[in-house]
């Protein structure tokens, strides 16, 4: 891999980790500091599964109503689509055979296992050095104090 090659942050976060029994794929979820997402859904603590939801008959990555599954990201862009910033993150596992998706980077699942709660800012500082930001939309980003030495900001 070249120095500036893109590497999905989810691959970095899951490196060396083992999926929980019965699960075959990793996902990432941004949540509020209170552990909740849209419409007040409260995610369980690490080491626990969410309730199982019957998915409605559509392939959308997003639930159409409460009880129509959970939206999980497989990329940072997909994770951020729920409107929560990457401060408080959950590393989750899901069963790929149950996932529905019509967008790259995010999907809808009937159940997820919460593996870990992550500090998004700390993770970025410690693990994402040398990130290739080619084409990144940084509109509105607070870059005060950011060390962008060597960052590829072309685009």
Question: Whereabouts are the PLM-identified features?
Answer:
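Short, glycine-biased loop/turn motifs at secondary-structure junctions and
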Residues: 1-155
